Every structure is written in C-alpha cells, then in structure tokens.
Amino acid sequence: MESFELIDNFFQIVVLICAAAAAGIFALRRRSRDLLILSLAYACFAMGTIYYVLYLVIIGIWPQVFYVAEISLLAAWLFYLSMQILRTEGMKLRVSLPAGAAAAFIAAVAFLDHDFGPSYFVSALFALTAGATVYLSVSHIQHGGLYRKRDILMVICVVLQVLLYLVSNYTHDYTRFQLYYAVDLALTLSMAALLPLTLREVKQA
C-alpha cells in the first residue's frame, strides 16, 4: 500500500469536501448559479478521488481501469466548463487565435497522452472539455473585463490536471514525495482557490 499516495488523496478529499460544502452554503445564501455549479464540481472531483482511495485501501493496489473515478472527474470538469460558459452571458466573444491555439494544444496533449485511461472516447471527451475551458478562459482574459483572476486560475487548473497525467507516466515510486505529488497538491489548492474568487465576483455582481 502506497502511504504517501493515501496522504495526498486524503488531503484532496478533505479540502474538496470542505470547499463543496462552503460553496453550497454560499450558493443557497446568495442564490448563485456559479457557486452551486462550483459546489457540484468539487463534489464530483472528491467522489472520484474517494473511489480511487477506497479501491487502494480495500484491494491494496492501484486501480488499473477505474471508470467510476474517471466519470466523476469528467463530470467535475464539465461543471467547470459550465461555469465558464455562464460568464459569456451578455458578452460578445470574438474569435481568438491565441485562445484557439492554447485550447488546441491542451486538447491535443490530453488526448494523445490518453489522460483518462485506455478509452479513446473518454479521453476525447476530457480533451474537448479541457480545450473548451481553456478557450473560453483565455477569451475572457483577452476581452472579458473585470474578473480575470478566476479565468487565469481556471487555465492554471486545466494545465495542472493535464500535467499531472503527463508526470504520472514517469512516476513509478509513490512511497515518497516527488513531482507528481507537488503537481497534485498544487491542483487541489488551485481548485479550492476558485471559491473565494467566485464568491468575490458574486458579491460584486
């Protein structure tokens, strides 16, 4: 059993469950769709990690094919994409070559690396979701006005997620802290940081 793998995943579960609960409470108080969607994204991501940890604890090995976790993680990223789509309401988006190039690069890397396991279909869905999220985020940064910090952080989250899968290809010893865990911790904290930025936008709206 990989002790540091468990520590890393337990940390992610605790952070995301707390963030999901907080976002849900604020969503009800503020009647905010953005915060509700963010809460659902956190919950889905945490569910995927919980399945992974339970498999690791009960069976004692890493799940080689774990579609339950993959579907949960994909659902989380679809919720993140929904947040970015909501930001386009009332905004005139122009075709952006930098945004298109960034989106195409992220989508290509995610698909070619088979980020979501051996399934080409699931990997393609994630690649399209990641690419669309990056495209909208970069477009908002270029043309979107007041709230660019959340868009920048969303791009960082996508990059860290794809980077995590790339790094995992070269990680064989999960018993000690190394680059894989640094990227995963950065991803967890970056996702959690979306909450205060989103809450600030909701308060100022």
PLM features per residue range, with description:
Residues 12, 34-36, 63, 92-96, ...:
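Short, aromatic-rich membrane-interface segments at the entry and exit
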Residues 133-205:
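C-terminal transmembrane-bundle signature of multipass membrane proteins
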Residues 19-30, 52-99, 134-138, 195-202:
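Internal transmembrane alpha-helix with an interfacial aromatic "cap," most often the third helix
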Residues 72-77, 120-135, 188:
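Generic alpha-helical transmembrane segments
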Residues 1-18, 110-125:
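Hydrophobic transmembrane alpha-helical segments in integral membrane proteins
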Residues 11-23, 34-58, 69-75, 104-107, ...:
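Hydrophobic alpha-helical transmembrane segments of multi-pass membrane proteins
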Residues 56-64, 110-121, 170-175:
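Membrane-interface helix caps and helix-loop-helix hairpins in membrane proteins
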Residues 29-44, 89-99, 144-157, 205:
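Membrane-interfacial loop-to-transmembrane alpha-helix junctions, especially the N-terminal start
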